[in-house]
Amino acid sequence: MRVAVSASGQTQLDELNPRLGRCEYFVIVDDVSGETWAIENTGRLSTGAAGIATATLLHNHQVDVVITGNVGPNAFTALEAAEIKVYTGTKGKVQDLLEQYRNGNLSKASGPNVGPHGS
């Protein structure tokens, strides 16, 4: 299983960036192999539909779960269509959020928690 966290930097020591579509990076952990790596969120460069572009990026990297602060309706729909589970309303360091996820201490989102464009 691959878990991605929207991040302000490229390591597990960096803070979560709460904006799914506009975060700089995703730190990805493969729970099977234990491998960790970061990808640049090229979706953030979109002039519109950054959340959808970001969902496509995560799908292309075979992500199963994404942990973030906020997700809008278009991004949530795209993530749901890609069968990527979404956990929102989080904050803190990437490593702490991954630990909370592994321990079952994060709540799966049932829908978007912000309006379009982060409003």
Residue ranges and their predicted role:
Residues G69:
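Conserved residues at the C-terminal ends of beta-strands
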